[in-house]
Amino acid sequence: GKAFEKAAGVLLEKHLSLEDPEPDPRFYPPWIVRLERYVLACRLEETLSLPGASMDDLRCLAEAFSDQGITATQGMQPSTNSLITRLMEDWVCHPGDRQRMEQVAEALALIRTIGAPYPAWHLQDLFISVRDGPALKWETGARAGAEEAVAWWGSFQALGRALGVCVPGGAGHPQP
């Protein structure tokens, strides 16, 4: 439980503090590698499920996973990933906010890089609600050449591709 996770984290921090300032994870003893994987997976699960988790928290964890060469977290359920769901729902409430949309795309990329599960169908459904509603206005603006609309539409199409959702005007769906 939580007590074991905390103890594992303390043990890992203690061991790493005794190592060289720039330790090479390839030379860690196997038990440290397993402990580190466990601690990072616990921190990831906690971060993804906390209501107050931020993109900075996710970026730090993604960096730690990358530094240690760890991917493919096992045992997590997609429903525990409330961070990406919260970001997506926030963007859906403010669909014209390109910064929020790009934050969703960044979070999705980081989560995929780490190998954490996420509720793909739910995210796709939320995306489709924007595609079939508010996005139509932005598409019209993009076709007219409005600079902000063109930028928004490009980000929107990229997010659609990342989610595996067809977007009119995207690849395979030529604009009329």
Task: Set out the residue ranges of the language-model regions.
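Extended alpha-helical scaffold segments
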Residues: 1-176
